[in-house]
Amino acid sequence: MRCPFCGSDNTSVKDSRAAEDDTAVRRRRVCESCGARFTTFERVQLREIIVVKRDGKRSLFDREKLQRSILIALRKRPVDRDRIDQMVSGIVRKLESGGETEVPSSEVGELVMEALKRVDPVGYVRYASVYRDFKDPSDFAQFIEKAALEDEDDDADGK
């Protein structure tokens, strides 16, 4: 593994442990050249997934981009990092197990919305405001009202 600080190939693993509900291995590494310490993660990749954007452009699915978007929605919210990692792993597993090599960005967005709705209602609304492109405060009000009605329906159905 190349050191991200000095570029040397002379690194060694100091500690390894399971992470993200045993779906990844977290490795603590040290560069023998500059002494820098850094962490890497190793995960199984079932297949490469291509995300098809609204404009038709295609790009390789980026787990880190998914995680960043969730972190932004949950900024300053009482959700610990392990819970966020579990959420990201769950979304990735759903995408990989779907069997499709190409997935519309709308499907990724809906999976994120479902996960955030279960974890943090404020993060859910924050993400929705960007994903659904809210233009003014009335868009927030309509979305929150609709979400509240769906919650009532779920409660009535015993979900």
Swiss-Prot record:
Keywords linked to the UniProt accession: ATP-binding, DNA-binding, Metal-binding, Nucleotide-binding, Repressor, Transcription, Transcription regulation, Zinc, Zinc-finger
Zn finger residue spans: unnamed: 3-34
GO biological process: negative regulation of DNA-templated transcription
Cofactor annotation remark: Binds 1 zinc ion.
Keyword Lyase: no
Cofactor: Zn(2+)
PROSITE patterns referenced in this protein's UniProt entry, alphabetically: ATP_CONE
MF (Gene Ontology): ATP binding; DNA binding; zinc ion binding
Domain ATP-cone: 49-139
Domain of life per record: Bacteria
Protein task: Negatively regulates transcription of bacterial ribonucleotide reductase nrd genes and operons by binding to NrdR-boxes.
Family: Belongs to the NrdR family.
Protein name per UniProt: Transcriptional repressor NrdR
